[in-house]
Amino acid sequence: RPNERYIDFQLKKQKFDIDLSNERQPFASPKDGSTMTLNDEFSLKELTEQQEDIKEQDLKFSANFKLPFKNGNKLKFGAKVVRKTKDKTVDFYEYSPLDEDAFMENSLKNTVDQSNKHFMPNSKYQTGIYASKEYTGALDLNNPALFEKEQVQEELAGNFEARETVSSGYVRFDSKITDRIELMSGLRIENTNLAYTGRTYDADEDITGKTERQRNSYINFLPSLLVKWNVNDDFKVRGSFTQTLSRPKYSALVPSVNIKRSDNEITIGNPELKPTTSYNFDLSADYYFRSIGLVSAGIFYKKIDDFIVDQVSTNYEYQGNVYTRFTQPKNAGNANLLGVELSYQRDFGFIAPALKCIGFYGTYTYTHSRVEDFNFEGRENEEGLSMPGSPAHTANASLYFEKAGLNIRVSYNFASDFIDEMGESTFYDRYYDKVNYMDANASYTFGKKIKTTFYAEANNLLNQPLRYYQGTKDRTMQAEYYGVKVNAGVKINF
């Protein structure tokens, strides 16, 4: 993201009326004598430019082997090495015009009204007048005759360099206990090595410095066991036990600092994070129809240790500064998940042969989760907490038509709300609101040696917003609308 520029204007001591009659759409309007429309009473608050460079590299090597035995038994084994690197470099400058009056006069001559009566959340929200992007982009910021510039040290505190190498090996034995019972057992060993360097920020001296290179390594043994019972050709029963691992992401681990000066907010990394491990038990039964389709039901249980969630504190003192909002990822405790999953797929040929080209696919999952050993300060004794990131209800449905190269599909997806971020009390907990998505796509393919496909797709037909709320469903914290996205084109395969 090169040359990312922002101009902030301000007008102090303005008074507003806050309308909370509809908490989902709160609205602030200026009182008499106050305004939120850019005019010559405003002054320059901040003029900045940021250069952000993120470099990522993934290197992978793997080798897999298989030894067949009598009676259909097989031994599989192999190894894999994955090395990932990620470097984030931000260079951030604040500029001060030498003649601020002339700069303001020129800025007010180069504005654009971004208001839109069709604004998706509600037409009452009008964004108003801004300096145009053409004007902002054309500013000669590095001309010393026009601007003074200063590197903003606290913005550099989010820089980091991270290295992760995962070396793994596995062995798996597939055996046939009887003609109808199969057993697959295995063990995967993963060795994770981490090295990262972040930044520190000294607010008193207004300087940043590199942290010492920190290293961490750990080994995980991940067993698995799967039993498959072919009751008959159409009915299958499966049971399994697996242990899985989820590693923290780079931005959570490295000792970096991200500061939003305008909002007095800070987010810091946590080098002490442990990976999240899960013990998984699954039991399912599948019945396959004579025609294309199946009906399936399953139950699952997961015991999760050291799940990670962002902890948010308000008016928090850190390194001598009091921040309005302080965020840090933490291992918040353990959790138990118990759930049921149902799925159904079938074409409509069983109704009439002519309907074989039309079909339906649907799934539904219910998940009950409870947190144990919750370790946020001041909330240790809370009960009945759901695991963050785990919606209780999810459902998917799809109606499709497939015939003679023509494919048409309409899909619907639903997920209920869930805790996304946890604060110092339940009042500050942030929830990701429920979502309803509907998509449609169609394609037509023809040709033998050279295949040509015309396709079209439309996503988010219901204009589902990304929405967060705080504590209760009506208390909007953030809402973003993206509208319907339509894409069409042609593909040719030789």
Task: Annotate the PLM regions.
Residues 47-50, 54, 64-66, 75, ...:
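Conserved C-terminal beta-signal and adjacent last beta-strands/turns
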Residues 154, 158-167, 216, 245-304, ...:
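Outer-membrane beta-barrel signature, preferentially recognizing the C-terminal barrel domain
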Residues 63, 67-69, 171, 175-177, ...:
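Residue-level signature of outer-membrane beta-barrel architecture
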Residues 7-45, 100-157, 314-317, 321-328, ...:
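Flexible glycine-rich, low-complexity coil/linker segments exposed to the extracellular/periplasmic environment
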Residues 1, 50-53, 57, 81-87, ...:
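Transmembrane beta-strands of outer-membrane beta-barrel pores
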Residues 68-75, 179-180, 234, 292, ...:
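Short loop/turn motifs that connect adjacent beta-strands in outer-membrane beta-barrel proteins
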Residues 1, 32-38, 45-68, 74-78, ...:
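Surface-exposed extracellular loop regions of Gram-negative outer-membrane beta-barrel proteins
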Residues 301-304, 313, 321-419:
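Gram-negative outer-membrane beta-barrel transporters
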